[in-house]
Amino acid sequence: MTDQEYMFRAIQLAKKGEGWTNPNPMVGAVIVKDGRIIGEGYHKKCGELHAERNAIASLTESAEGATIYVTLEPCCHYGKTPPCTEAIIEQKIKKVVIGSRDSNPKVAGKGAQILRESGITVVQDFMREECDRLNPVFFHYITTKTPYVVMKYAMTLDGKIATKTGASKWITGEPARQEVQHMRHRYMGIMAGIGTVLADDPMLNVRVEGWKSPVRIVCDSSLRIPLDSQIVRSAKEYRTIVAYAGREENEEITEKIERLHAKGVDTVCCPDEKGQIDLKKLMTYLGNEGIDSILLEGGGTLNDSALRAGIVKEVHCFIAPKLFGGKNSKTPVQGIGIGLPSEALKLKCTDICRIGEDIRIICQVCEKEQEGPCLQES
């Protein structure tokens, strides 16, 4: 096997931790000696052993003189687990091949430096682009302390997310809907608007046994959420946050908040100067709550607000081979729109694939001020 194949194996191992490691990154490690893999591992869950230590624990023979391929710079600080640099040094590994650089200020090059000072050969930025793709959420959250927001919607070939009556079940087929369940498991939070709650009464949970459900966030400026909605009734089972604007703190609003709290719902007031929810303030609050990523499953109004607020980093669009037609049928992004094509929000397509009979397109959002590639481009 080649160096590239060993690192590719480490990348595949890292992906096994998807949905479980947050807010930690996904990391894989492979230990090679005399052209043979003698140990491998990945970070399975936040709070548990890191990839390097799991790889060492799986060793079939001494790692003295071996090379370890790791997708992210080894940590060098004490947290919930001891430093991985210590374990690598103790095993007398002679070479460390690193993919991504760790943006965590507690590491940020210090891990590689400690290894070099111990006489270990360190190769950095090996297959960095491929390794960076594992952890856009981690890189964003560790540097901004705000969630990485992914906007997801399903639409027909003529760009409709619902019929003129508001009906939307189901636009895509079962394979695409199963992928959405996987996405809900992958991200720490899921966010929808009050319009979606009133129209569909969704649970916004994961319906696959053994997968974790995200924290549910509802944007509801005027606190219209029904106390008998599925989301409120299940709030003691799944953490639920309702964000409101607090335009008028009257007795009725106060009573509604108290009743929501009694049912297990958390509330947060994030008003802007227009009496709507300030999504940037909400992201700061959610980041402080330890929520590193959000799957935005909003309607056209919330999607428009999120894009205008600049909080969306990725767009995942599922397109079904159907036509709804109708000027009153709902679209993924509402609002007043733009006047000229040159004013469009620029996206960079990173993946297109077929899922059953449907097509999924993934794009990164480019910064408006930027010329050339997206800031998030890996």
Question: Which sequence ranges carry the predicted segments?
Answer:
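Proteins enriched for Cys/Gly/acidic motifs involved in redox and nucleic-acid/cofactor modification
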Residues: 19-21, 112, 126-154
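Charged/polar positions on well-ordered alpha helices
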Residues: 12, 16, 43, 53-57, ...
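Short beta-strand scaffold segments in enzyme catalytic cores
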Residues: 26-35, 153-154, 361
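Enzymes that bind and transform nitrogen-containing heteroaromatic metabolites
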Residues: 3-8, 13-17, 22-24, 80, ...
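Short, conserved alpha-helical segments within structured domains
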Residues: 25-27, 127-130, 298
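A short, flexible N-terminal coil/short beta segment enriched in small residues
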Residues: 10-14, 29, 34-41, 130-143, ...
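Zn2+-dependent cytidine deaminase-like catalytic core
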Residues: 31-130, 215, 246-251, 307
